[in-house]
């Protein structure tokens, strides 16, 4: 459930921002070309974020790494909202938020694959991916409601940080709960053989 919630929230943020970020930036007084360039920075850093989080997941507990990724995503998404004084600063904040967010989101299938037992792994990951798509749909539509509500740029990005923070909390809950669940007999036997 926590993996599905996290993936849902991640796609909600991603599709809302990739669909509506140019219009939101235009509302701050930027030209359409400036808004398009800044928007392109959001997914651009994803490759960097994936490499960094992937390497960290191999060295540190993957749940904690991805949870921190979501926590930092929330912080930097919020900071985007308060960077309207400078388009260059906004571009940097969007790039960092996109790098971390895309890294955390792209790490989710690997995290899920490590969580589910072998016989149910494909089903578990598929459910997470499928439920996450509904977050993407909701994200694309949510932008219209936020624009219609005429909320400030700062307010919109502060609200957008909430799903990222919820994702971090969900992964920490998943980590705590899965740590307290005893291994099944088959898992215990395989650990004893190793």
Predicted regions and their residues:
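A late C-terminal transmembrane helix in Major Facilitator Superfamily
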Residues: 113-149
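Extracytoplasmic gate region of multi-pass secondary transporters
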Residues: 1-50
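Structural signature of the two symmetry-related core transmembrane helices
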Residues: 64-79
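Multi-pass alpha-helical transporter architecture, strongest
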Residues: 161-188
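Helix-to-loop junctions at the C-terminal end of transmembrane segments
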Residues: 50-61, 147
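A membrane-interface helix-boundary motif in multi-pass transporters
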Residues: 147-162
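Intracellular juxtamembrane helix-capping segments at the cytosolic ends
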Residues: 103-116
């Amino acid at each position: 459930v926590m993996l599905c919630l996290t993936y849902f929230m991640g796609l909600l943020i991603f599709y809302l921002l990739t669909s509506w970020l140019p219009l939101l930036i235009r509302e701050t007084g930027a030209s359409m070309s400036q808004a398009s360039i800044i928007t392109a920075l959001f997914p651009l850093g994803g490759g960097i974020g994936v490499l960094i989080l992937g390497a960290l997941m191999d060295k540190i507990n993957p749940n904690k790494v991805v949870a921190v990724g979501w926590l930092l995503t929330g912080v930097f998404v919020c900071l985007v909202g308060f960077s309207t004084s400078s388009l260059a600063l906004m571009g940097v904040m969007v790039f960092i938020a996109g790098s971390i967010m895309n890294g955390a989101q792209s790490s989710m299938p690997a995290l899920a694959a490590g969580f589910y037992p072998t016989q149910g792994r494909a089903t578990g990951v598929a459910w997470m991916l499928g439920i996450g798509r509904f977050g993407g749909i909701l994200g694309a539509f949510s932008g219209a409601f936020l624009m219609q509500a005429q909320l400030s740029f700062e307010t919109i990005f502060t609200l957008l940080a909430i799903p990222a923070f919820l994702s971090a909390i969900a992964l920490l809950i998943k980590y705590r709960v899965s740590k307290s669940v005893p291994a099944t007999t088959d898992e215990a036997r395989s650990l004893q053989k190793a």
